[in-house]
Amino acid sequence: MSIHMFPSDFKWGVATAAYQIEGAYNEDGRGMSIWDTFAHTPGKVKNGDNGNVACDSYHRVEEDVQLLKDLGVKVYRFSISWPRVLPQGTGEVNRAGLDYYHRLVDELLANGIEPFCTLYHWDLPQALQDQGGWGSRITIDAFAEYAELMFKELGGKIKQWITFNEPWCMAFLSNYLGVHAPGNKDLQLAIDVSHHLLVAHGRAVTLFRELGISGEIGIAPNTSWAVPYRRTKEDMEACLRVNGWSGDWYLDPIYFGEYPKFMLDWYENLGYKPPIVDGDMELIHQPIDFIGINYYTSSMNRYNPGEAGGMLSSEAISMGAPKTDIGWEIYAEGLYDLLRYTADKYGNPTLYITENGACYNDGLSLDGRIHDQRRIDYLAMHLIQASRAIEDGINLKGYMEWSLMDNFEWAEGYGMRFGLVHVDYDTLVRTPKDSFYWYKGVISRGWLDL
């Protein structure tokens, strides 16, 4: 048996996102988001699912916070629905929406749980999309207005803030690959969006400092990790592009004030470049307090200039590893490698694992429980790598499992379950899974024994 220790002040938590759990999509003055529009469009989401009700967390604050308390987490990462507080994206404030988040945060604090707030987890107000969305600089100004509102409303209660969750998804998965809302397929638009997101991030960080908010602010890119099929220059560069596409492209401008040259050159060779205007890079390039690491899987890649290699000429091939039910290969060592790379490149900043978890669609057994041993095994092997990172001097301060409960899994609908808590979508009954009790034990002890 080996013991894997974590510091006594380690921030154990779980994570969710507004559109995936809240429901109440047209109640109490909430405006429409791009995900409402997308999910209501036939063929965009599997089974025609949508977030109209989701987990109904909007009406179940006390019940869900009690689950968090029972689990024993120190922090709860959630996101704010921008159209719930600013239905048109700017202008008139929806007080009922703000009151909901005050109730949630107050309930968390009353139960000894720190709120860890994400400002933007993909649910752009549709009113702003109608004006060009993140492809327009109008949305940068709108985001600054929204961020200032939330800092003033909740800055005295929330000490940790994330500006954007997984900007690669918002830029490229949503506007180049077309898989997520708003469903565009335009590479230049995706590059424009990625730049505008970073400028908006810079605006929010500036406001956070100017308002004197006490706490930390950072960003959570979906930093992928690709390993080369062969140790050739071509395959290693193919992996560098995959990692740079989702990670370095967002973190380099923040930390170094410029985009990574290898990615700029790649885009320019294809005929594309980001829409930089005077002052943008200076605004983006300012200190943040932490980086959020979202990690689920790795890929093995090789150079392929053909169709299979895609825009990056980088083809993902199977590692031959076991897969979760969503089809993602399991490679826990990739989490360590990603933490090591991020620490080494960016000066060993404070890191939080802001998402890590597994999709397994285990149902209720005859005994009324959900025996999700595969999820327990997945979490254990990744926590071992997190512990290893801490032992090796990486400044990792917390771990937030994805997710507290089964929820609306974006374009996959409700068919893919990531939760520690099972949700019956017909009755909305919550049932903690075996992994819930296992994770509760890890949190209470502060160590793993395997």
Swiss-Prot record:
Protein name as it appears in the record: Beta-glucosidase
* Enzyme Commission numbers on file: 3.2.1.21
Enzymatic reactions = Hydrolysis of terminal, non-reducing beta-D-glucosyl residues with release of beta-D-glucose
Family statement: Belongs to the glycosyl hydrolase 1 family.
**What's one GO MF term for it?**
beta-glucosidase activity
Cited NCBIfam families? BGL
Which keywords does the record carry? Carbohydrate metabolism, Cellulose degradation, Glycosidase, Hydrolase, Polysaccharide degradation
Q: The organism's lineage?
A: Bacteria, Bacillati, Bacillota, Bacilli, Bacillales
The enzyme class is: hydrolase
KW Hydrolase (keyword) present: yes
- InterPro entries, from UniProt? Glyco_hydro_1, Glyco_hydro_1_AS, Glyco_hydro_1_beta-glucosidase, Glyco_hydro_1_N_CS, Glycoside_hydrolase_SF
Gene3D superfamilies attached here?
A: Glycosidases
Active site annotated at which positions? E166, E355
